[in-house]
Amino acid sequence: MATTKIKKGDSVKVIAGKDKGKEGKVISVSNGKVLVEGVNTITKHSKASQANPKGGIIHQEAPIDASNVMYVQKGKTTRIGFTTVDGKNGQKKVRVAKATGDIID
């Protein structure tokens, strides 16, 4: 599996699925899945326990596949590529927005 070009903290837009068109910030990335703030929310019913004496209904985000989100820069979606730049310790690989050519990080 290829490495994910989306990183934690990126602004993304959902391009496929039931939440298509929604935007949010990436909370976490793991195994090709991303957790996006306010997107793909599920309802969990928790039973009362010693740790959670009240129990109840919890709403939380569920992971979606990284291929279903696109990076958002200046209000527009763009693909992400990689390039190398010269640094003080040799060359460094950085992410680049394909639409504008701007370095992301």
Swiss-Prot record:
Keywords: Ribonucleoprotein, Ribosomal protein, RNA-binding, rRNA-binding. One of its GO terms (molecular function) is rRNA binding. Signal peptide: none annotated. The keyword DNA-binding does not apply. Transmembrane segments: none annotated. InterPro entries: KOW (IPR005824), Rib_uL2_dom2 (IPR014722), Ribosomal_uL24 (IPR003256), Ribosomal_uL24_CS (IPR005825), Ribosomal_uL24_KOW (IPR041988), Translation_prot_SH3-like_sf (IPR008991). It holds the Pfam family KOW. SMART domains: KOW. GO terms for cellular component: ribonucleoprotein complex; ribosome. Belongs to the universal ribosomal protein uL24 family. This is Large ribosomal subunit protein uL24. It comes from Lachnoclostridium phytofermentans (strain ATCC 700394 / DSM 18823 / ISDg). The lineage of its organism: Bacteria, Bacillati, Bacillota, Clostridia, Lachnospirales.
